[in-house]
Structures are given as C-alpha cells and as structure tokens.
Regions:
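Catalytic cores and adjacent flexible loops of soluble metabolic enzymes
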Residues: 1-118
C-alpha cells in the first residue's frame, strides 16, 4: 500500500507543490508515500520529493510535449524520463543510508591530519 501526494492542475504551478506533505502523510498513515507529478519541470519537484522520502514517482510520458492534450505540457519525453531516473538514482546515493562510517577515501587525509593528544 502506498499513498501518492498529488496536485491536480496540468501543469502544476511549482509554488503549489507543497512537498512537505510527504513526511506528514508518511507519519499520519504509516505507509510509503510517493509523488505524482504534473509540473512541466520534473527535476525541480521530483528530486526534492525523493529527498523528503517519496518512495515512488509517477509521471505522464509522451513522445512530443507539443502535441494536443490536457497533460502534454506536464508530461516527460523519453529523454526527460531518462534524465529524471538518472538524477533520482544519484540523489539516492548522495543521501546514503544514514550510518556514519569512515570511508576508504577518507583514510589518507585521516592519517595525515590526525594528531594524538597527550
């Protein structure tokens, strides 16, 4: 079971995204919460949604955003979808797992800068 936080306008005005609802819905309903995006600039809203805990992103796709239709302007073309997935995967790596550790890449600096105080 997963709820989707959504705005019904096509395209959605960015200032109406109210992404802070994601953690609120997660806490209130004790379930996964995703984001259903209808904005014309996907990464401006989908990336912060992931950072706030969205566990899925729902987007409309089209082969051409200039085609006639209510949701074409708010849809992603294939290249836009590829970029969005790439960026979300990078953000997931950047956010990490929340466990503090010393990374292998830190060891040389640690050896160089660490001093023993007596």
């Amino acid at each position: 079971f997963e709820l989707l936080h959504c705005h019904s306008a096509y395209p959605m005005p960015l200032e109406e995204a109210n992404l802070n609802m994601i953690p609120i819905l997660k806490k209130k309903f004790r379930c996964k919460v995703g984001y259903s995006g209808h904005e014309s600039s996907a990464s401006n809203v989908c990336i912060p949604a992931v950072m706030l805990g969205a566990t899925s992103i729902e987007r409309h796709i089209t082969l051409n955003r200039t085609w006639y239709g209510d949701d074409q302007a708010a849809s992603l073309e294939p290249d836009g979808l590829k970029r969005l997935v790439r960026d979300i995967r990078l953000i997931e790596k950047i956010l990490g797992d929340g466990k503090k550790r010393v990374w292998r890449s830190e060891i040389p600096a640690q050896k160089k800068l660490r001093q023993i105080l007596t």
